[in-house]
Amino acid sequence: MDSAPNFIPRLLLLSLLIVSIPLTSSQSDANTTNPSPSPPSDSDLCNGVFVSYTHTKGSKIPPNDTANQPYRFESVITVLNHGRDELKSWRVFVKFAHREILVSASNAVLSDGSSLPVSVENGTVFAGYPSSDLKSAIQTAGDVTQMQARVELVGTQFGVAPPNVPLPKNITLATDGWKCPKATQKGTNVLQVCCIPDPDYDNREIIDNEFLPRKDGDLTIMYDVVRSYSSNYMAQVTMENHNPLGRLDNWKLSFDWMRDEFIYTMKGAYPSIVDSSDCVDGPQAKHYQDLDFSNVLSCARRPTVIDLPPTKYNDSTFGLIPFCCRNGTILPRSMDPSKSSSVFQMQVYKMPPDLNISALSPPQNWRINGTLNPDYKCGPPVRVSPSQFVDPSGLPSNRTAFASWQVVCNITQPKDASPRCCVSFSAYFNDSIVPCKTCACGCSSNKAARACSATAPSLLLPQQALLVPFENRTELTVAWAYLKQRPVPNPMPCGDNCGVSINWHLATDYRGGWTARVTVFNWGETDFVDWFTAVQMKNAAPGFEKAYSFNASTIGINGKNNTIFMEGLPGLNYLVAERDGENPLKNPRIPGKQQSVMSFTKKLTPGINVPGGDGFPSKVFFNGEECSLPTILPMRSSQHRKHISVFLLALPVLALLILRA
């Protein structure tokens, strides 16, 4: 009985000890298994599109050149869609800064259509390929493989030796409808930016139609799949000119097949080289063992397509395609709407794994050019809503293409590119002509082979020298410089080397108006059919009245109605090539020529200074190509009468020189 009171406290103490043990253990486990969460990454904090550029590796490559050492670089561009909607046709601009030459790029193409390797020292835009769209996390339940694009780059840069990192100056999302701040650097090798939707951009059409809207451009190309089978499809290619001064002569269209496709047949156009050897020696012949490859038109990875002559328009094999077969001529709509587009069809065979009716992929890296025409840069094909065509059966219905892509091309001026036409100025108050600039259309880069100066300014000319080829002008030019008491450089200035030149002559200036004379010279070997020229007048265009030998009118460009468009009248639309003189052994060759006087009124342009500059164009175009202009204007001298008398005294000397020539 005495032990009972001692037993109860001991039992109570033991119970408390047992209860306290698991409590202590539980608290300890909680502290060790639940560490504080790590901070979210920069991409997780972006509620838009996250773009990053990561330099991964660099190394020195030959040759050894301390002043201009090349290095290999490897980097990765990541585009991650953290927005609410799908990102259509993603494009990323990278502002390279170290004279980079891009050698390879995975999962992307260059949006300007350039083929690798290519210099990207001024920056370039990458476009997604073969997958150009990025789904959102909402659409994919967070599947990063559908939300993200990863582009691995390999190239060469100059001057940045490891361990230094050749990061670009900036990266940004170039897709329409997005706003990006300046990219920030993280660490030593990462440049990143978070782009958000532009609240002022209307993207309802994209959301409603699931296709990007068609865009405007100087020239658009539609790639429409009009028939599709498991192994091949029929594509219709339509080129349309939308620039009032744009034009193509003898167009040549090229592109890159990216998935081993080849062209079996064509209508409305033809490859510049017909060759199936690449298929016979490649995987195409192994897969299509029963196909007669002697009938294949082109197996080139980058074929060049040319237009057919008009004689093939009604040919059942090669023609019978609307708007085909015009020798590659595409005119502005203002000249002839029926000649402002060109169309052809081609049957394209596919290769595994694309052997099903819905596996359709357009070619990439489109490029188009012509002779004596503007230069175009074309973007990547963009998937748009299927095109509709009039039913060929004549029924009042439209047929829809299986799939459609649009390529937009715009006129550009390549760096260091030379014009292909030039302008000279003259006026009634000065008997000298301000000629085209020295080397206006380029000169040989081989200084040793030149017997002339590419830097000396061109010498003033007498009026009659305009009709004489440059190589026959020397005596006239030197004699004129002597009479005008002007120095003659040694060596003499080089010629302009232009196939086409245009003389703008200010003919009269009176109280109520003024006149000018335009003369177009063709010094080349090719006739120009349906030629046109255009002059931009900053202040005088509203006063234009008429051209007496040309069909001319004022047109608006970029919202300004200051350009006068001129073309040959019916029957006079040929600018013939240079031809032999009456006596080829004695007389110089004669250029093709078209000329007209233009009249202007001052009623709508009061206060203009015609001789001081308003009577001369600020820009001149021939067949869409912008021409080189002189840097000086004819001078109006108080000694004008004295100049006339000197000119009259010089006439016998000049006549003697012409007879000797």
UniProtKB/Swiss-Prot annotation:
Signal peptide: 1-26
Residue span(s) of the pro-peptide: 638-661
Lipidation sites (GPI-anchor amidated serine): S637
Gene Ontology biological process terms in this record: cellulose microfibril organization
Gene Ontology cellular component list: endosome; Golgi apparatus; plasma membrane; plasmodesma; side of membrane; trans-Golgi network
Superkingdom of this protein's organism: Eukaryota
Pfam families named among the record's database cross-references: COB_C, COBRA
Residue segments, region Disordered: 26-45
Protein localization: Cell membrane
Glycosylation-annotated residues: N31, N64, N122, N170, N314, N327, N356, N369, N398, N410, N430, N472, N551, N561
UniProt topology in membrane: Lipid-anchor; GPI-anchor
Known tissue expression: Expressed in roots, stems, leaves, flowers and siliques.
InterPro entries: COB_C, COBRA_pln
Keyword annotations from UniProtKB, A to Z: Cell membrane, Glycoprotein, GPI-anchor, Lipoprotein, Membrane, Signal
Family per record: Belongs to the COBRA family.
Protein's name in the database: COBRA-like protein 7
Protein's gene: COBL7
